[in-house]
Amino acid sequence: MSYEKVSQATDLVIGTKQTLKALEQEEVLEVVIAKDAEPRVVNKVEAMASVKQIPIIYVDSMKKLGKACGIDVGAATVALKK
């Protein structure tokens, strides 16, 4: 998945807390994680996505991921909902 796919998605969950909630409720199709995010921030998302067998896609930049989501700040994680 690329930034372009995120920017074209119609149903996104932005941020680590919201991504974790969506994963718990099994509403997630794919998870996008920025490589420059702090490991302590994204570890739970990675673990839960792995357990639930949700594909994880890595992108280079939190700032670019946030911009692709239409926000002016960086985003560590984004989930595409089913």
UniProtKB/Swiss-Prot annotation:
Keyword terms, alphabetized:
RNA-binding
Can you provide one Gene Ontology molecular function annotated for this UniProt record?
Answer: RNA binding
As for family, the record states:
Belongs to the eukaryotic ribosomal protein eL8 family.
Pfam families referenced in this protein's UniProt entry, alphabetically: Ribosomal_L7Ae
Amino-acid biosynthesis as UniProt keyword:
no
The protein, known as: RNA-binding protein BH0128
Carries keyword RNA-binding? yes
By its UniProt entry, which InterPro entries does this protein fall under? Ribosomal_eL30-like_sf (IPR029064), Ribosomal_eL8/eL30/eS12/Gad45 (IPR004038), RNA_bf_YbxF-like (IPR023460)
Looking up NCBIfam families in the UniProt record yields: PRK13602.1 (NF010125)
